[in-house]
Structure formats: C-alpha cells, structure tokens
Regions:
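Conserved catalytic-core motifs of GNAT/GCN5-like acyltransferases
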Residues: 130-132, 150-164
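Conserved beta-strand-loop-alpha-helix junction that forms the acyl-donor binding cleft
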Residues: 131-141
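Conserved GNAT acetyl-CoA-binding A-motif
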Residues: 122-132
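Conserved acetyl-CoA-binding loop-helix of GNAT-fold acetyltransferases
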Residues: 105-119, 142
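GNAT-family acyltransferases
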Residues: 1-106, 119, 165-191
Length: 191
C-alpha cells in the first residue's frame, strides 16, 4: 500500500510521523476519548508508545496510521488507520479512530470515513471494508450506522478491556456492491 495523504476541503488525513507526537499528546489528553479504546494517552510515554506501535505496524505493512488534521485550523485533532490489511482477500478494517471531544458530532468523522472508503473501493479496489466497536460505545455505533455501514452482528467475549472486563464487539461492514449507494449517502451528508 502506498503511503498517501487523503484530503478534501474540510479535513486532511496524513500519514502518521514521529513529528506528530506533540499534536497527538495535546489532542489525545482527554480521558473520555479512551473509555472504549484498548489504549490510553495520558502522558508523553503513552504517546511515544502509541506512535512507535503504529509506525512499527506501518513498516510491517499491516496497518496504515493517519493523523486527522482540521484544514481550517491546521491542528491535529485525532487519528485513524487502515488495519487488518488483507491483500489476498481484498479487505481491510478502518479502526483506531478517535477525535478530540471538541470535534465529536461534527462533520469531521463523516469526511474522514468518506475519504477512507472512497480510497479503499476506488483506488485499492477492495471487496470489503469493516469497522468494529465496543458494544458499550453507543456513540460510535450511531456514527458507524450513520455513514451507511451494515451491522453484521456481535462478536461475543471478543476482547479483554484494559480494566479486565470483557468486551463484546459490534461488527459492521461495507462491501463493494454497497459502495455506490453508501457513497451517494455520504456525499449528501457532506453538503
């Protein structure tokens, strides 16, 4: 996979780099971001680990991490990535998406997903893109459903959270056959 920057007039998704550490630390320092995530960013060491792990996965070509930049302010406001990349079966997952709370319930996530999905289906020619979330993360489920993804089911006892409790995972997907309709839907939301 080529390391690319995706952007429109609202948002820029640029490949994560070591130089993004300060922006991620500032943007990710809100505990509410991490309540349903498998990682937490509270201090510089957490950011270092987050970026190191992401860059390692990028070098291994198993993930492609982006930072999310608000085009109006130029600030880093979150992160997302392509992960579980499977060339043989022409699929990947969009995941590890987080935004600083000031950008929750804005057009940013919709713009990000549109850019990622369009690239996945129209440039990578994938058959399937999946997105999954914690069953307790209702806000995320609503956001995924809002973009037009199909809820496939729940993976029971799928993960152990950082606090030791069991997480069930809600699985969503968009297939190549669904993409034209989802694309039209997203383009209406972006207007």
């Amino acid at each position: 996979m080529e390391f690319i920057t995706l952007e429109n007039e609202v948002v820029k998704l640029k490949p994560l780099e070591l130089s993004d550490l300060p922006g991620i630390l500032e943007t990710g320092s809100y505990p509410e971001i991490w309540s349903h995530m498998s990682t937490t960013i509270e201090k510089k060491e957490d950011v270092n680990k987050f970026v190191e792990n992401a860059l390692k996965a990028k070098n291994e070509k198993t993930e492609f991490p982006f930072v999310i930049v608000d085009k109006q302010s130029g600030d880093i406001i979150g992160s997302t990535r392509f992960m579980d990349i499977d060339d043989k079966h022409q699929r990947l997952e969009i995941g590890y998406t987080w935004l600083t709370p000031a950008y929750w319930r804005t057009a940013i996530n919709t713009n990000c997903k549109y850019l990622l999905l369009r690239y996945s289906f129209e440039h990578l020619h994938l058959q399937r893109v999946q997105i999954k979330t914690d069953h307790d993360n209702i806000r995320s489920q609503k956001a995924i459903e809002r973009i037009g993804a199909t809820k496939e089911g729940i993976l029971r006892n799928h993960m152990i959270r950082k606090d030791g409790t069991t997480r069930h995972t809600v699985m969503y997907s968009i297939t190549i056959e669904e993409w034209p309709q989802v694309k039209k839907h997203l383009e209406r939301l972006l207007v």
